[in-house]
């Protein structure tokens, strides 16, 4: 059995060397973390669901001309992706007050914002991913002004698409987090969407009941995380109504 070279391991995913130059294999783990690993658990089946949901969303984004790193899903837990140079920022798009925004500004959770708000956080676990401004980003060279414009344009288009997609299946897109990277193609470089989009990185509420269908179920000790993720997948038509919960999937080849 061939051993694959591990490139990077994060909180919820592992990146391995891909089969061809310029590619990587992205493996989705069952680890659930919150508050920068201060809270941690392993929830059987979570990685499989995130892989399927993220595949579905990235495939649709590619089809409408939003560039992503996604190439194809390989199996229940793995995707083949393009290798990019990750920009060290988390880009958060907020449509409804929730989480840290509600707490920071004293806004009642669930309040619809006057317009969508884009926030930037510097990716540094040791610092608890501090919120930063565009001035910080350009001053420290994390991204150029043009790259920031490209990132914001991508974020707005993704928000428009996701809001409509989820609303069509009775889900409100409260907010979501994305990461972007630089894709080098010969002498050209462009900014594309990387990482994942799943209930791990979105706040999703049922339109009618406001029931949480995302990682807040883990953050707030509500339970039922896998069931909520399965419901998101069912509503999107990714898994059938009667499909049983998945187990751990194929054994990871290290």
From Swiss-Prot:
Question: Where in the sequence is the signal peptide annotated?
Answer: none
Q: In which pathway does it act?
A: Purine metabolism; IMP biosynthesis via de novo pathway; 5-amino-1-(5-phospho-D-ribosyl)imidazole-4-carboxamide from 5-amino-1-(5-phospho-D-ribosyl)imidazole-4-carboxylate: step 1/2
Question: CDD domains, from UniProt?
Answer: SAICAR_synt_PurC
Q: Does the keyword Cytoplasm apply?
A: no
UniProt-listed InterPro entries: SAICAR_synt/ADE2_N, SAICAR_synt_PurC, SAICAR_synth, SAICAR_synthetase, SAICAR_synthetase_CS
A GO BP term here is: cobalamin biosynthetic process
Reaction(s) catalyzed by this protein? Answer: 5-amino-1-(5-phospho-D-ribosyl)imidazole-4-carboxylate + L-aspartate + ATP = (2S)-2-[5-amino-1-(5-phospho-beta-D-ribosyl)imidazole-4-carboxamido]succinate + ADP + phosphate + 2 H(+)
Give the UniProt keywords, A-Z. ATP-binding, Ligase, Nucleotide-binding, Purine biosynthesis
> What's a Gene Ontology MF term here?
ATP binding
Task: Give the GO cellular component terms, alphabetically.
Answer: cytosol
A Pfam family that this protein carries is: SAICAR_synt
Q: What is its EC number?
A: 6.3.2.6
State the Gene3D superfamilies in the record. Answer: ATP-grasp fold, B domain, Phosphorylase Kinase, domain 1
Q: Please give the family membership noted in the entry.
A: Belongs to the SAICAR synthetase family.
Q: What is this protein called?
A: Phosphoribosylaminoimidazole-succinocarboxamide synthase
The species is Sinorhizobium fredii (strain NBRC 101917 / NGR234)
Name of the gene: purC
């Amino acid at each position: 059995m061939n051993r694959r070279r591990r490139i990077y391991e994060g909180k919820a995913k592992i990146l391995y060397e891909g089969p061809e130059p310029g590619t990587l294999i992205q493996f989705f783990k069952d680890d659930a973390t919150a508050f920068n690993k201060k809270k941690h658990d392993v929830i059987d089946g979570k990685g499989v669901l995130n892989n399927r949901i993220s595949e579905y969303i990235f495939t649709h984004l590619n089809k409408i001309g939003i560039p992503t790193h996604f190439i194809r899903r390989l199996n229940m837990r793995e995707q083949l992706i393009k290798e990019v140079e990750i920009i060290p920022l988390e880009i958060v798009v907020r449509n409804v007050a929730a989480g840290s925004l509600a707490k920071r500004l004293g806004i009642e959770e669930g309040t619809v914002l006057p317009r969508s708000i884009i926030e930037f956080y510097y990716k540094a676990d040791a610092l608890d991913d501090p919120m930063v401004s565009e001035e910080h980003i350009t001053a420290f060279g994390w991204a150029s002004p043009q790259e920031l414009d490209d990132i914001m344009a991508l974020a707005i288009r993704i928000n428009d698409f996701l809001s409509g997609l989820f609303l069509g299946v009775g889900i409100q897109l409260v907010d979501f987090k994305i990461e972007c990277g630089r894709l080098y193609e010969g002498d050209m470089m462009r900014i594309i969407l990387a990482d994942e989009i799943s209930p791990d990185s979105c706040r999703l509420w049922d339109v009618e009941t406001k029931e949480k269908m995302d990682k807040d179920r883990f953050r707030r000790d509500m339970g039922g995380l896998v069931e909520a993720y399965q419901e998101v997948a069912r509503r999107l038509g990714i898994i059938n109504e009667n499909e049983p919960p998945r187990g751990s999937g194929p054994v990871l080849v290290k």
